[in-house]
């Protein structure tokens, strides 16, 4: 029965209430914040559960009246009330199911986005720069803060790769479905014959990780320093300020050269490394849980083609949500809300199917 799934909630709330009264908990701010968040989440479910039970009670009362009432006009009024209550019941039940979905603990975190040019040479690098601008413009609209961490620029101003940080409310929740291969179809500025070309760039959205979230053993790291280089490969610094860190157990390599000081470059590289290792561990856990089963709307795999940007047709097609929007110019200027909200709804619907109550 639907309500049976909700029965343990009140006892969990009582346990958390007792935990919050412990003065020692306040000393551990991280654990305290986590407990408050869980308590508020369960309180939301309890409020909806109470509302649901109240509606069921009203339905039962009206059904009893209907079975006993002889006046036809009164019966019709009761039937109308029952129809309204049943609609309300379905609505509240759906809201409870959404609340019961797995809560992503990373949703409230800041993020690091990595964009890499894929197939398509210079045109792919220019598209990678376009994607960077799209996300930074969207961040401006959302009043989020962005900070460039590292980039490798081409002579025409494209990005072979770029890493940047976005800070703000629910950043990961909003942008987490952007990981994957973004494909572009357009006539490149380098193409003299005006032929349409298909290029691609890969986007990775990583939740920002604190030192306490993942443990990195210094013995597992190889750190190399070298001179920074600019577009075309020329050296832009006379000192060995650029840093490359290799995590030996996983083979993950991170490099950073955009800060003038070696120390700052190392800090930025470690920030990216923590995020990548955290993602690496999460992907392993997901594979174990799902036994390699991928959601129908997309796995979030970086190798998965998720979206096509067709410039001649002013069209953006998202292959997971199966929608095409003829507003490419607006989307490239950071008008992403409709697209992102549609995607979130698609993933939500799939989760409800996978976790049917």
Swiss-Prot record:
List of residues that carry N5-methylglutamine: 234
HAMAP family xref list: Rel_fac_1
GO cellular component: cytoplasm
Family of the protein in this entry: Belongs to the prokaryotic/mitochondrial release factor family.
Predominant place of localization: cytoplasm
Subcellular location: Cytoplasm
Region (Disordered) residue spans: 284-313
GO molecular function, one term: translation release factor activity, codon specific
Biological function: Peptide chain release factor 1 directs the termination of translation in response to the peptide chain termination codons UAG and UAA.
Naturally occurring in which organism (per UniProt): Borrelia hermsii (strain HS1 / DAH)
Compositional bias per record (Basic and acidic residues), positions renumbered to this chain: 284-307
Record PTM text: Methylated by PrmC. Methylation increases the termination efficiency of RF1.
Ion transport listed as a keyword: no
Protein name per UniProt: Peptide chain release factor 1
Record InterPro entries: PCRF (IPR005139), Pep_chain_release_fac_I (IPR000352), Pep_chain_release_fac_I_sf (IPR045853), Prokaryotic/Mito_RF (IPR050057), RF-1 (IPR004373)
Gene name of the record: prfA
Keywords: Cytoplasm, Methylation, Protein biosynthesis
């Amino acid at each position: 029965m639907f309500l049976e799934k909700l029965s343990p909630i009140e006892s969990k709330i009582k346990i958390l209430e007792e935990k919050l009264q412990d003065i020692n908990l306040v000393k551990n701010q991280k654990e305290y914040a986590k407990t408050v968040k869980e308590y508020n989440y369960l309180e939301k479910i309890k409020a909806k559960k109470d509302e649901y039970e109240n509606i069921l009670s009203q339905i039962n009362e009206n059904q009893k009246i209907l079975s006993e009432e002889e006046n036809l006009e009164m019966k019709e009024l009761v039937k109308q009330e029952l129809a309204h209550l049943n609609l309300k019941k379905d609505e509240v039940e759906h809201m409870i199911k959404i609340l019961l979905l797995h809560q992503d603990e990373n949703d409230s975190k800041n993020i690091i986005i990595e964009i890499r040019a894929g197939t398509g040479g210079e045109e792919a690098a220019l598209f990678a720069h376009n994607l960077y601008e799209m996300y930074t413009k969207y961040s401006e609209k959302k009043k989020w803060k962005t900070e460039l961490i590292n980039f490798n620029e081409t002579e025409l101003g494209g990005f072979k790769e770029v890493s940047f940080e976005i800070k703000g409310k629910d950043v990961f929740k909003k942008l987490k479905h952007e990981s994957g291969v973004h494909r572009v179809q357009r006539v490149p500025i380098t193409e003299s014959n005006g032929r349409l070309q298909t290029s691609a760039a890969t986007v990775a959205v990583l939740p920002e990780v604190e030192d306490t979230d993942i443990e990195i053993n210094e013995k597992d790291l190889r750190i190399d320093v070298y001179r920074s280089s600019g577009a075309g490969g020329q050296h832009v610094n006379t000192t060995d300020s650029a840093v490359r860190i290799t995590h030996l157990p996983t083979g993950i390599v991170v490099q950073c050269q955009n800060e003038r000081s070696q120390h700052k470059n190392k800090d930025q590289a470690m920030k990216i490394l923590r995020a990548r290792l955290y993602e690496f561990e999460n992907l392993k856990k997901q594979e174990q849980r799902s036994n390699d089963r991928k959601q129908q709307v997309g796995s979030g795999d970086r190798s998965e083609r998720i979206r096509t940007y067709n410039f001649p047709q002013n069209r953006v097609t998202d292959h997971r949500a199966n929608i095409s929007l003829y507003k490419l110019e607006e989307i490239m200027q950071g008008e992403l809300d409709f697209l992102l909200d549609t995607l979130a709804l698609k993933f939500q619907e799939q989760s409800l199917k996978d976790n049917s109550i």
